[in-house]
Amino acid sequence: RLGGALPELHLPLPGTGPNAFIIVCSTVPEDRYVDIDLGISVQSMLLQAAEIGLNGICIGAFDKERIRQKFHLESEPLLILSIGKGIEKIELVEISENDDHRYFRKDGIHYVPKVRVEDLIIG
């Protein structure tokens, strides 16, 4: 389900849905290292998508068992990537680690909060 944080908008709007979904799975039990590898691989795919002019989002809130059954997966689905050509203006907004992390829309712009680098580095 896309746009879960903005249910009143009934996203995606007709004709604006993603062109592809990639279900990222693991053949071994999920643990810390699987999650690290997941992050690296997904980031690489999203960077490549951006390089060729596409947008993408990670979907982590989904019914794993339903996806596994629907696509006859033997492996554990961990994340779904949604890839497509974006039509909306997106702006990143720097926030502190304690601010609200939910994305929002205002005046036709889709705002995506991102924690400041200074707040991510522990040292």
Regions found by a protein language model. Give the residues of each.
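Acidic, surface-exposed loops and disordered segments
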Residues: R1-G123
